[in-house]
A protein has these predicted regions:
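Long, C-terminal-biased catalytic regions of enzyme "large/alpha" subunits
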Residues: 1-175
Length: 175
């Protein structure tokens, strides 16, 4: 399911970049050159609870490792597929990805001290494909606070744990 959601997110936001009216020429140039996206997730606490993990447990840390690896992998693979279909973003050559550097190469190695989970996706093939075809987007993921979108979705904020057993949230646009 995550694979399909990541692909749908990348392809939908790709269409919005081209559909968007840009009131400032500089914004249009920057956006079309880099085609940056900011796909993140909300409801991590719910995901962990639903899968039987306390937020600060070893099981949770292992589950988050698996989730975030898959999330990054599927986003990159979708962008790589779009690059095959439409070409890479104009500024691809100025990204770390053009040098074959992937998130698995730059993550904070302290993570290895809290989880022994190993990588499960075929990163070597993806690296080769990215070097050959590029990426359609220079940035794909972002972990935003997501306060207002979590209200609309009736979910917990992004990656944050709940603040208490009961939370009452209101958006500026109403309950």
């Amino acid at each position: 399911e995550l694979e399909d959601l990541c692909d749908l997110s990348v392809r939908s936001l790709e269409e919005l970049i081209d559909y968007q009216d840009y009131p400032v020429r500089a914004a249009e140039i920057a956006t079309l050159g880099r085609r940056s996206l900011g796909v993140g997730f909300i409801g991590l606490a719910h995901y962990l609870a639903k899968n039987g993990h306390k937020y600060d447990s070893q099981g949770a840390w292992d589950a988050v490792h698996k989730l975030t690896e898959s999330f990054q992998y599927y986003l990159l693979r979708s962008s790589n597929q779009l690059a095959r279909e439409k070409g890479p973003c104009a500024d691809f050559g100025s990204t770390k990805y053009s040098d074959g550097i992937l998130p698995i190469d730059t993550y904070k190695s302290d993570v290895d001290e809290i989880t022994q989970e190993r990588l499960t996706h075929d990163w070597d093939t993806l690296r080769t494909d990215i070097k050959e075809f590029g990426l359609r987007h220079s940035t794909l993921s972002a972990q935003m606070p997501s306060e207002s979108s979590s209200v609309v979705s009736n979910a917990t904020n992004g990656i944050e744990p709940p603040r208490g057993y009961l939370s009452i949230k209101k958006s500026k646009k109403g309950p």
